[in-house]
């Protein structure tokens, strides 16, 4: 598992996985590469992309460009953790993300750690079960994060004030 950091216009890019693809043709083997990349602004925006090319740098560049185009917003609590515990599943990849107190750090493995770092999460506990396939783990993590509701969103649904929702939080 390779990780690569690159700072540019406030967006952090992390290379999560590179895979070599072999196509057998009449004259022999043709090699290609696929790259899985996560990008984020470390303040609640994140994008994930997968791209293929004949050379590794081209695959990474394509994936970065695609990920920048599909940025989504994830609400963060105090800019450091998630609002509540969430569960996500994609294929055989299952993930449980739990909010953590200040100073805990990112307790997560591999691809989930990369997602948390580019998203700007500083305190979280994650447990991944099932597969260790980075594609499925990242998709499961994104599904879990998208299930999350902020107190502002819950307050609008219930027609209450944000302070009423937050004070009941345990």
Curated annotation (Swiss-Prot):
Residues 11-74 form the S5 DRBM domain. GO terms for molecular function: rRNA binding; structural constituent of ribosome. Keywords: Ribonucleoprotein, Ribosomal protein, RNA-binding, rRNA-binding. It holds the Pfam family Ribosomal_S5_C. GO terms for cellular component: small ribosomal subunit. InterPro entries: Ribosomal_Su5_D2-typ_SF, Ribosomal_uS5, Ribosomal_uS5_bac-type, Ribosomal_uS5_C, Ribosomal_uS5_N, Ribosomal_uS5_N_CS, Ribsml_uS5_D2-typ_fold_subgr. The keyword Cell membrane does not apply. GO terms for biological process: translation. Belongs to the universal ribosomal protein uS5 family. Part of the 30S ribosomal subunit. Contacts proteins S4 and S8. With S4 and S12 plays an important role in translational accuracy. The N-terminal domain interacts with the head of the 30S subunit; the C-terminal domain interacts with the body and contacts protein S4. The interaction surface between S4 and S5 is involved in control of translational fidelity. PANTHER family: MITOCHONDRIAL RIBOSOMAL PROTEIN S5. This is Small ribosomal subunit protein uS5. It comes from Pelagibacter ubique (strain HTCC1062).
């Amino acid at each position: 598992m390779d990780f690569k950091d690159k700072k540019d216009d406030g967006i952090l890019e992390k290379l999560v996985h590179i895979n070599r693809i072999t196509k057998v043709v009449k004259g022999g083997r043709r090699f290609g590469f696929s790259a899985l990349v996560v990008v984020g602004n470390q303040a609640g925006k994140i994008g994930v992309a997968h791209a293929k090319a004949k050379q590794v740098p081209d695959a990474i560049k394509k994936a970065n460009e695609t990920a920048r185009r599909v940025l989504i917003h994830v609400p963060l609590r105090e800019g450091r953790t998630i609002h509540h515990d969430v569960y996500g599943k994609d294929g055989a990849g299952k993930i449980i993300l739990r909010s953590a107190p200040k100073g805990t750090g990112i307790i997560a493995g591999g691809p989930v750690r990369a997602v948390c770092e580019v998203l700007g999460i500083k305190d979280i506990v994650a447990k991944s079960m099932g597969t260790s396939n980075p594609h499925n783990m990242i998709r499961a993590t994104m599904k879990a994060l998208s299930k999350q509701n902020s107190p502002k969103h819950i307050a609008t649904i219930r027609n209450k004030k944000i302070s009423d929702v937050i004070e009941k939080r345990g």
